[in-house]
Design a protein with these regions (language model features):
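Phosphate/NTP-binding elements of NTP-utilizing enzymes
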Residues: 1-167
Length: 167
């Protein structure tokens, strides 16, 4: 899945969101910059999700798949930076950005704060696909390409505030 357009990156992202749908409280989110761009991903999900889970249901109004376990995968967009508040107060075990370089750093970093467990037993993580170019090219390159050669794990430390207010 190198950087080539049409290389299957978006398909892999749509399929990756299925990894934890056996967990009833699992919530996944797949993002594109605009809803029209998102429609191709929804079409891919129709092909893959129905085949893997014949009784899963897609709600076209709310753009969400509901699985037999109770798990849900949402499809969303963030055309403007201010749209990030549509995700305020929400938690997603998995967040997938399709075409990450179309997003501003502020949008990506805000969504990282939404990437948190919805209950016990889920793996919380984020994935992204991208091609060169776009408004976010500079920050994506600075964050993921410049720091180290390919294949090098990049660890980031952060301070976490506990419920009692301590860090």
């Amino acid at each position: 899945y190198g950087g080539a357009a049409g290389g299957g990156k978006s398909d892999a992202l749509v399929i990756e969101a299925l990894r934890q749908v056996h967990i009833p409280h699992y919530r996944g989110l797949i993002l594109r910059k605009t809803y029209p761009q998102l429609s191709d991903l929804v079409d891919k999900s129709m092909a893959y999700y129905k085949r893997a889970f014949p009784t899963a249901q897609y709600n076209a109004t709310s753009h969400v798949w509901a699985f037999p376990s109770g798990a849900k995968i949402y499809f969303g967009s963030m055309q403007y930076t201010k749209d990030r508040t549509n995700y305020q107060g929400k938690a997603f075990d998995f967040i997938g950005f399709d075409e990450l370089t179309h997003f501003e750093w502020e949008e990506y970093s805000y969504m990282m704060s939404r990437n948190r467990p919805t209950g016990p037993g889920t793996r919380v993580y984020l994935r992204a696909t991208t091609n060169p170019g776009g408004v976010g090219h500079g920050w994506v390159k600075a964050r993921f390409i410049t720091p180290a050669p390919p294949g090098t794990p990049i660890e980031e430390e952060c301070t976490v505030q506990m419920p009692d207010g301590t860090e």
